[in-house]
Amino acid sequence: MEVRRRPPNPAVHVASLTYQVKVPGSSPSNILEEIVWYKEREVNAWREQLPLQQLQNQVRGLTQTPRDFLAALRQAPTRPAVIAEVKKASPSKGVLREDFDPVAIAQAYAANGAACISVLTDEKFFQGGFENLQRVRAAVDVPLLCKDFVIYPYQIYKARLLGADAVLLIAAILSDADLRYFLKIAHSLGLNALVEVHSLPELERVLALDDLRLVGINNRNLKTFVTDLAVTEHLAAQCRDRDLLLVSESGLFTGADLDRVTQAGAQAVLIGESLVKQPDPGLALQQLVGDRPSA
């Protein structure tokens, strides 16, 4: 694990007011660490509102089986298969789309070749939300990835309850033990897990996991937000003898970009910014994949 964790500051309740007690400690060293530290507080607040056991009971009461995210990627009619992202903003680029309608964007994706759809559920840094996940779930039939920064099992159960078919697990923010445990939880709930890496050490850790099926290679360094497609080329070469589906993520804008990562070994791509910034995201997706070869 490359990112430091920091438990939530203790709270003191006085009458109707709540104060966060300051504790000694340094500031986050990068944006990824800032996000993770915020998630510690966010999930802690969720657990106070709805304890984990109650959340688990609600999940057990679900009757609908999750859609098969991995199968949808494998069976996509084009290569690479596309996971199109519903994304309003990012810490590095700010607001990507002012007239943001998650349902309309998701429906446009589904109608124009997306094998799966990724929905940002982080509110503070990406202006997403679980409400968007629920609304998109009700509007489209393709499998959905809950895109967030998972650091506790609670988030996996919440994603399952609110309509996700897959969750993102980021190696840079999880220990080896947590990766194994979270992967097992996701699979036990019928969810696929896209396990994301950015470096060779992260990939080596992830390849040691049992029952690994999906690996996301993020071309963006989450500490600096710099993108480089050479990351996919370098890391995909280490996976050629593995029965895995590789997803290249970030920095993909043109057909030439898709060709490059496909030739490197990626069978799928996750694309967000280059689509949502266009006047018609569905048309942008169609133009990007419309002339792709059949799988």
UniProtKB/Swiss-Prot annotation:
InterPro entries: Aldolase_TIM, Indole-3-glycerol_P_synth, Indole-3-glycerol_P_synth_dom, Indole-3-GlycerolPSynthase_CS, RibuloseP-bd_barrel
Recorded catalytic activity of this chain's protein: 1-(2-carboxyphenylamino)-1-deoxy-D-ribulose 5-phosphate + H(+) = (1S,2R)-1-C-(indol-3-yl)glycerol 3-phosphate + CO2 + H2O
GO molecular function, one term: phosphoribosylanthranilate isomerase activity
SUPFAM superfamilies on file: Ribulose-phoshate binding barrel
Keyword list, A-Z: Amino-acid biosynthesis, Aromatic amino acid biosynthesis, Decarboxylase, Lyase, Tryptophan biosynthesis
Family: Belongs to the TrpC family.
Protein name: Indole-3-glycerol phosphate synthase
Gene3D superfamilies: Aldolase class I
Superkingdom in the source lineage: Bacteria
Organism the protein comes from: Synechococcus elongatus (strain ATCC 33912 / PCC 7942 / FACHB-805) (Anacystis nidulans R2)
One BP term from GO: L-tryptophan biosynthetic process
Pathway listed: Amino-acid biosynthesis; L-tryptophan biosynthesis; L-tryptophan from chorismate: step 4/5
EC main group: lyase
EC number assigned by the record: 4.1.1.48
